[in-house]
A protein has these predicted regions:
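Short, solvent-exposed polar/charged micro-motifs at secondary-structure junctions
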Residues: 25-31, 123-125, 171-172
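A generic secondary-structure signal marking the coil-to-beta-strand transition
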Residues: 14-17, 59, 140, 147, ...
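Helix-centered, glycine/charged polyanion-binding patches within enzymatic domains
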Residues: 88, 93-161
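Charge-patterned, long linear interaction tracts outside catalytic cores
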Residues: 162-189
Length: 189
């Protein structure tokens, strides 16, 4: 695939990797029409990405009909990105489960930097993370948010495809085009 070639042509450090998900609107109706019919927009596509924080390239992505839990994507993403030998994997509170933390620590052999949910009381890795959580490393997670911002600003946050299958492909295409866009920025430096 094209995305794999882009990643091969770039030097990826992979020391810090961040995970997150964001929605892309799927409605092609006008906002005014949505107000008139007194209905919210029907559905959206959830775009899950994992990025290399240093190069700001998307290493792995998946698109699914939303709303979905971020945890379903996380395990597959962690198994896919472990080839980069990350030292830290960053994610927001939505990814705070013992299963995800176990996968990060045991399979990827990395440290999880995920803030605890307010009611976290059990689990070996969850309790251990109270001592290993580093705010200065976690603060770099905002890079994944800025990538979503760039994708939605430059390549549009609304999918024009009417079918779910084409809408998922459109979202994946936006991710690949973002990587091409980012590669040109890296090469200009």
């Amino acid at each position: 695939e094209l995305n794999k070639q882009i990643l091969l042509n770039n030097q990826i450090d992979g020391e810090i990797i961040a995970l997150d998900g964001s929605g892309f609107t799927n409605d092609y109706a006008d906002k005014y029409y949505a107000i008139i019919r007194r209905k919210e927009r029907k559905s959206y596509v959830k775009n899950h990405i994992s990025i290399d924080v240093e190069s700001r390239l998307i290493l792995h992505f998946a698109a699914q009909r939303g709303p979905r839990f971020d945890t379903r994507f996380a395990i597959a993403a962690i198994r896919n990105i472990k080839k980069y030998n990350p030292k830290y994997i960053l994610a927001d509170r939505a990814y705070d489960t013992e299963l995800i933390r176990k996968c990060i620590n045991e399979e990827a052999k990395a440290e999880d930097q995920i803030p605890l949910k307010s009611r976290a009381k059990n689990g070996h890795y969850r309790l251990k993370s109270k001592n290993t959580f580093q705010k200065e490393i976690y603060s770099r997670r905002n890079n994944v948010e800025s990538i979503f911002s760039v994708i939605k600003r430059i390549f549009n946050g609304t999918n024009r495809s009417r079918s779910l299958q084409l809408s998922n492909k459109e979202t994946k295409l936006k991710n690949t085009i973002y990587n091409i866009y980012r590669t040109t920025q890296i090469q200009e430096k």
